[in-house]
């Protein structure tokens, strides 16, 4: 079954084309089901598909916990978690979906690109 590229699919494609340090990008629903994803061809998987899904689900659960504090500290815009090998960026989308981007570990150049994605996601709410 082929899918037509909707706005979220285009966003994933834009990330992979526009951020040279991006390893993986995905959009999930609020249950952690992967709706769109792309992985750079020359990149080896660090996690298995099941480990990736479990990690995405934990991230979604963490965002739900953050929402409990939003009245006091404001709505969360994005989160960056640094690991030795990668950085994982999560950005909530307007429809309850979540954008995940995994980038190479020590590449500070990507931060400006990530902020452009955050601004893009916020402007399409």
Task: Give, region by region, the residue ranges found by the protein language model.
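Non-catalytic interaction/Regulatory regions outside core domains
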Residues: 1-125
């Amino acid at each position: 079954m082929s899918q037509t590229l909707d706005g979220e699919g285009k966003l994933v494609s834009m990330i992979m084309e526009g951020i040279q340090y991006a390893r993986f990008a995905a959009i999930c629903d609020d249950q952690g089901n992967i709706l769109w994803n792309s992985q750079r061809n020359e990149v080896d998987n660090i996690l298995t598909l099941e480990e990736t899904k479990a990690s995405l689900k934990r991230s979604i659960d963490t965002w739900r916990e953050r929402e409990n504090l939003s009245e006091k500290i404001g709505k969360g815009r994005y989160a960056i978690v640094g690991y030795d090998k990668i950085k994982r960026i999560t950005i909530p989308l307007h429809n309850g979906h979540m954008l995940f981007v995994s980038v190479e570990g020590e590449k500070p150049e990507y931060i400006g690109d990530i902020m452009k994605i955050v601004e893009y996601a916020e402007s399409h709410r």
